[in-house]
């Protein structure tokens, strides 16, 4: 370490400490009849995404990626999958960079693992594996920021 460096410069800026399934639920409410009803049909599959962050220690944060997927056919649920996939991250960054990294980069790192869990759960549930397309966490961050600004403007 040179005189110009500080100890924090030697530390990784972003460290993944652990990843885990915080909550997982999968159900096929109409089975076995729903398997017959969906033959040759393409259900509507809306995907709801949310990211929550909590501080768990000095520079350590839990980031939880929430996915709720409900396959619908003629207004009836074929399957419902809810996943909360979390990671604990240590950040050694300037204060102004922490919030965007927690809500953009950390969920981007978690997403491939959550995507794999979704594919495995649907396949193991007797359905074709649902392969989620990549998510744009930058756009989600911008939408969330715009929503918060609108709420603050109304207050």
Swiss-Prot record:
Annotated SUPFAM superfamilies: SecB-like
Keyword Transport: yes
Gene3D superfamilies given in the database record: SecB-like
GO cellular component, one term: cytoplasm
Family matches, as InterPro entries: SecB, SecB-like_sf
Compartmental location: Cytoplasm
Phosphoprotein is among the record's keywords: no
One protein family per Pfam: SecB
Signal peptide: none
Entry GO MF terms: unfolded protein binding
Superkingdom assignment: Bacteria
GO biological process: protein folding; protein tetramerization; protein transport
Function: One of the proteins required for the normal export of preproteins out of the cell cytoplasm. It is a molecular chaperone that binds to a subset of precursor proteins, maintaining them in a translocation-competent state. It also specifically binds to its receptor SecA.
UniProt record similarity statement: Belongs to the SecB family.
Protein name: Protein-export protein SecB
Organism (species): Paramagnetospirillum magneticum (strain ATCC 700264 / AMB-1) (Magnetospirillum magneticum)
